């Protein structure tokens, strides 16, 4: 399957859209996920953020649209932004909606104020940072945990090791199952 995870903040939506158009693949063969950045949180702002992303991607419908992160200093704007995602979902402009980087207390407050439970919460998860409590919370609410940096990220080094991929336990499991460490 082909899943492209992009975001307004990455500055690459236009390039992703061009790649999709030049790929020759049927749109149904590509799953596109993008994220609304915090400067587009609010009601109309979020709808405008969606329009900007859809235009850059060259798409009428986005498969998964999520909020890039909570805005704790103005959490009401985070909720308003998500309510705009709910509207886009109801209108068929997006197929699924979710959040990213929400921790348990964000989820608790958030779920009391929205109608649609997020399909996903994209969080940092890897062998050295499993966020078990948050993953249990996801399971309780039917939220899929989607990992970013699932192999340890580009800056996470534990105990002087170079990379999660060099971890002796990971290497041992890879050898045992005849797989690459990745």
State where each predicted segment sits:
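Acidic-and-aromatic substrate-binding clefts and catalytic sites of carbohydrate-active enzymes
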Residues: 5-15, 39-44, 72-76, 125-131
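Local beta-strand N-terminus motif with an aromatic residue
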Residues: 29, 59-62, 94, 118
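Beta/alpha (TIM)-barrel catalytic core signal, keyed to glycine-rich beta->alpha loops juxtaposed to Asp/Glu
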Residues: 70-182
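N-terminal binding-site loop/beta-alpha segment at the start of enzyme catalytic domains
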Residues: 1-30, 80, 84, 154
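Generic structural signal for well-ordered alpha-helices
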Residues: 13-20, 47-54, 82-86, 107-108, ...
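Glycine-centered flexible beta-alpha turn that most often forms the glycine-rich phosphate-binding loop
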Residues: 4, 62, 97
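CE4/NodB-like, metal-dependent polysaccharide N-deacetylase domain
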Residues: 46-67, 87-91, 112
